[in-house]
Amino acid sequence: MLICLTASHHNASFEVLEKLSVAAPSVAGTLMEQNDFIAGAVVLATCNRFEAYLDVEEPLTAARALAVEATVDVVSGASGIARDDVRGSVDVKCGDAVAEHLFAVSSGLESVVVGEGEIAGQVRRALEGARTGGTTSTGLERLFQTASNTSRGVKTRTGLQSAGRSMVRLALDLAESRIADWSATRVLLVGTGAYAGASLAALRDRGVVDVHVYSPSGRAQKFAGPHGIPAVEGRDLLKALAASDMVVTCSTAPTAVLAAHHMQGAAAVSGDGRRRLVIDLGLPRNVDPDVVTVEGVELLDLETISLHAPLRDLTATDDAREIVSTAAAEFRAASAEDEVAPAVVALRTHIFDVLEGELERVRKRGDSSEATEKALRHLVSVLVHKPSVRARELARQGEGARVVDAVQALFGLDVEMPAAVSSPVAVALPRTAEAGQAS
């Protein structure tokens, strides 16, 4: 059973999202350690989203409620947000709704800047992180891999991502009126994570040629070399700030790396009274809001940038939604087929075991030949093929439980029924998207 707890710019404040992002690294591992019924967990944390995807294998009726409560407890403990506030900040999606939601997220349909391309890479890295941490599962692997495939389909078959939309490009759009000449603008890039490359590319597309990079974690040289830009050491940070007209921060540091005293120091070093624009793309925030108390400093943070998100392209969005819906339907069908697989395997194994037993008795009587055995095996394969195909068809129609019941009743086979095939009594959950409902 797949479950997703999601908090985003749609239903949570940036203050809450900032605290949740701090909790992200530890949530999946803690959930797995503390709850045997959770088979897998993947956490996706971006600049406007925190989501926990769970694979719950416990067949109990209350499994969904237990998984939600366990996740809320872990997130509350890791983030410092009161439990009730965490509960009030997340939507819960179960079953079929999970796939459609993630496919839409990975395609950029749920982003602040609809169609932005960075989210696909963030979804991919979330799965890679779960693999590294040993918290993924077969079900989550398929879910996230299908999400990546769906995102690629949206990118190639619609115009949704053709404009190169992203938060950093939107931020630079907003900065346009403050920049007289991009080619003469000196920029300090703070951070070397996944978003740093996109930020550098966006700056270069504007014509920026003077970019230095500083890393709070000391990885500036590693980033600077391949990208052909100078690295800034910690001891030279104030000097680099002083020489900059614009600062773009995209670090994954858990606390602010720039504050008012840094900007005051930079102003003192430069001594020219220049204006500086600081663009903070970090979550949690990389820049203390108190920088605006320094004369000449202007701050664009994620919350401000989000207020200026462009209207979506309705035609491209509708086309993308159609692709997502189709992919989600196919994912549901494939998952349903998997649910009857044990019954189909048990049936085929039973019938072929019976055949082998009969052939063995015939051999002992000396009445067998290679041609006869080959013909009988072919006949049994033909006879088993139709029920196998029909079982998958019924599963796609939501009749998987009937298939399992029939195999057990007619052949006396003990088929272990996967939890996902069962039909437990619905458990009341707050703000929940049940299977089959729109995400």
Swiss-Prot record:
Substrate binds at residues 46-49, 111, 116-118, 122. It catalyses: (S)-4-amino-5-oxopentanoate + tRNA(Glu) + NADP(+) = L-glutamyl-tRNA(Glu) + NADPH + H(+). Pfam families: GlutR_dimer (PF00745), GlutR_N (PF05201), Shikimate_DH (PF01488). NADP(+) binds at residues 191-196. The keyword Phosphoprotein does not apply. Keywords: NADP, Oxidoreductase, Porphyrin biosynthesis. Pathway: Porphyrin-containing compound metabolism; protoporphyrin-IX biosynthesis; 5-aminolevulinate from L-glutamyl-tRNA(Glu): step 1/2. The record marks 101 as: Important for activity. It comes from the Bacteria. Gene3D superfamilies: Glutamyl-tRNA reductase, N-terminal domain, NAD(P)-binding Rossmann-like Domain. It is an enzyme of class 1 (oxidoreductase). The active site is at 47 (nucleophile). PROSITE patterns: GLUTR. Its EC number is 1.2.1.70. InterPro entries: 4pyrrol_synth_GluRdtase, 4pyrrol_synth_GluRdtase_dimer, 4pyrrol_synth_GluRdtase_N, GluRdtase_CS, GluRdtase_dimer_dom_sf, GluRdtase_N_sf, NAD(P)-bd_dom_sf, Shikm_DH/Glu-tRNA_Rdtase. GO terms for molecular function: glutamyl-tRNA reductase activity; NADP binding. One of its GO terms (biological process) is protoporphyrinogen IX biosynthetic process from glutamate. During catalysis, the active site Cys acts as a nucleophile attacking the alpha-carbonyl group of tRNA-bound glutamate with the formation of a thioester intermediate between enzyme and glutamate, and the concomitant release of tRNA(Glu). The thioester intermediate is finally reduced by direct hydride transfer from NADPH, to form the product GSA. Belongs to the glutamyl-tRNA reductase family. Homodimer. Possesses an unusual extended V-shaped dimeric structure with each monomer consisting of three distinct domains arranged along a curved 'spinal' alpha-helix. The N-terminal catalytic domain specifically recognizes the glutamate moiety of the substrate. The second domain is the NADPH-binding domain, and the third C-terminal domain is responsible for dimerization. NCBIfam families: hemA, PRK00045.3-4. Catalyzes the NADPH-dependent reduction of glutamyl-tRNA(Glu) to glutamate 1-semialdehyde (GSA). This is Glutamyl-tRNA reductase. It comes from Clavibacter sepedonicus. The gene is hemA.
